[in-house]
Amino acid sequence: SGDTTIIFKIYNFLKEKGVNVDICGANEEANYDDYDIVHLFDIKNIFDAYKHFKLASNSKCNIVVSPMYFNMEKFFQYSDNVERNNLWNNCKAYRELILKKSKIIFCNSIYEKSLITKDFITKGEIKVVYNGVDINYDEVPLYNFKERYNLDNYILCVGRICDIKNQLELSKVCNELGIDLVLIGTTSEESYLKECLSYSTTHYLGFMNDYDLYNAYTFSNAHVLASFSEVTSLSSLKAAAYGCNIVVTEEGASKEYFKDMAIYCDPYNHNSIKSAVEKSKVKRKNNKLKEYIRYNYNLKNMLEGIYEGYLKLMN
C-alpha cells in the first residue's frame, strides 16, 4: 500500500544518511526510550498507530506523525454503512490525541493541512511535504505488456482492490464502453474483487513489481482511479511520471497535485466516471504532465522535506 511504500523509502534514505532507524510493525513493540523520534503513519486506520502512540507517549522520544488523513464520513453515509460511520466518529478523540501530542504533523498537501485544522485541535508544527515518486526504468527495455496478457487497448487501475477505491463502478463503466480494464494490486475483499470480475472486460493481474508496473503504465490508454478517499494517490503520481493520461477523483488533493493536466471525475456519479474514461481514450499523451510531476513530486524532494523536519526537531 502507499503508506508502506513511503515508510520503506524513508527507512532506506535514513540508512544511507547513517541514521539508526528501525521499522516497528503493527503487532510489534519496541523500547521507545532508545529512540529520539518515533514517526507514526496513517490515523485513518487508527488502531495500529494508536497502540504505538500509547507506548511511545510514556517515553522520552519525540512523536511525529504523517496522518494520511481523509474524512470518511461522506463515503460511509453514501454506502449506508452505519456501523463503519459510528466507528469512524467514535475514534475521532484518539486521532486528535495523537495529533495534539505530535511535535510535527507531516501533511502531504495544503488540502490535508486544512482538513486537519478543520477537524482537530493541534499543537505542534504542521509541515506540508508533498508525496513523491521515483523513476527507475527509463533506460530499461520494455516488454510488450499487451502481447503478454493478450490485451488490446486497455484502461489501467493500480491500487488496493476495495470498495473505497471504487473499482466496481469503474468495471461497470469499462464494460459499458467495451474497453478492457486491468486491475493491479492486492485485495483483502475477495467478494468485492469477484463482483468486479463478473464483468468480462475486467482483468485482475494481482500484485506486480515496479518493473512490471512500468510496462503496464507505458502501454495503457490511461490510468484511472475514481476513488472515494484519496488525499493523493502514489499510483496516479507514478502513472503520470511515466507519461500516462490520468483520470483522478475530484475528492481530496488531486487538483492541488495535477492542476489542469488530469481528467477529473466525481466518484459518486456513474456518468461522470464514464465521461472521464471516454475523454481519456481519445486524449493524446504528451510530456507536459510527465515533466511537471518528475520535477515537482520526485522522491528526493519528499525525503529531504521529512529529513529537514527531523533535523529541526533534534536541534
Regions found by a protein language model. Name each.
Residues 228:
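Aromatic "clamp/platform" in nucleotide-sugar-dependent glycosyltransferases that forms part
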